[in-house]
């Protein structure tokens, strides 16, 4: 019991130190006076998540440059250097509830009725092309959406270790390859 309490205090102390990187004295005071459970949850967040929480997912302009730079520094690329992998594997990842589950938030899947939390991705590759810039942008948003959209609810698939760089490249291929069923078949529910 005593050892567990000491461990919890040590973790809270380290988290508090990390949070101080972003938070001012007033914010830290509010966290510490919000109650034990609140402080434990809040202080156990990663510093970037804590920053989003403090600012209710709307970062002030003066924090954006550093935040975006830090988020972009987290992006890792496939060992092959190729940002488009196998679209068939990408389709299996995109449409799998236990993998990326992209269709739950985005409309455009030819396999499942899509959600509307995120933007429609219907015929994504046909509308945007497959240029290197489009491949890079698509890969980076999937890897770490916060590098472009700070504090968005979209999973940060690579940054959070949910998908490997190679799996993300497969999803990019699924979205962009003109031969992919994502671009050749109608989306479920399309008119």
Predicted regions and their residues:
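Post-cleavage N-terminal segment of exported redox proteins
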Residues: 11-87, 141, 175-191
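Gly/Gly-Pro-rich "capping" loops immediately C-terminal to redox-active cysteine motifs
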Residues: 88-91, 95, 103-139, 153
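Sec-exported extracytoplasmic/periplasmic mature domains
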Residues: 95-98, 143, 147, 173-180
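Surface-exposed patches in mature extracellular/periplasmic domains of secreted proteins
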Residues: 102-104, 156, 182-188
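Residues that flank catalytic or metal-binding motifs in active/ligand-binding sites
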Residues: 117, 150, 167
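Mobile, glycine-rich extracellular loop/lid and propeptide segments
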Residues: 160
């Amino acid at each position: 019991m005593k050892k567990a309490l000491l461990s919890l205090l040590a973790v809270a102390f380290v988290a508090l130190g990390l949070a101080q990187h972003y938070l001012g004295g007033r914010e830290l005071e509010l966290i510490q006076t919000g109650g034990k459970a609140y402080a434990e949850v809040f202080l156990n967040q990663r510093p970037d998540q804590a920053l989003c929480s403090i600012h209710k997912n709307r970062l002030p302009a003066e924090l954006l440059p550093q935040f975006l730079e830090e988020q972009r520094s987290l992006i890792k690329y496939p060992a092959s250097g190729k940002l488009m992998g196998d679209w068939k594997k990408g389709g299996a990842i995109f449409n799998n509830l236990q993998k990326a589950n992209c269709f739950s938030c985005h409309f455009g899947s030819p396999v499942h009725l899509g959600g509307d939390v995120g933007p429609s991705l219907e015929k994504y590759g046909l509308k945007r092309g497959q240029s290197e810039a489009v491949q890079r942008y698509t890969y980076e948003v999937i890897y770490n959406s916060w590098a472009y959209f700070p504090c968005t609810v979209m999973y940060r698939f690579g940054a959070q270790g949910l998908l490997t760089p190679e799996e993300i490249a497969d999803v990019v291929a699924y979205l962009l390859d003109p031969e992919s069923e994502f671009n050749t078949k109608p989306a479920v529910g399309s008119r």
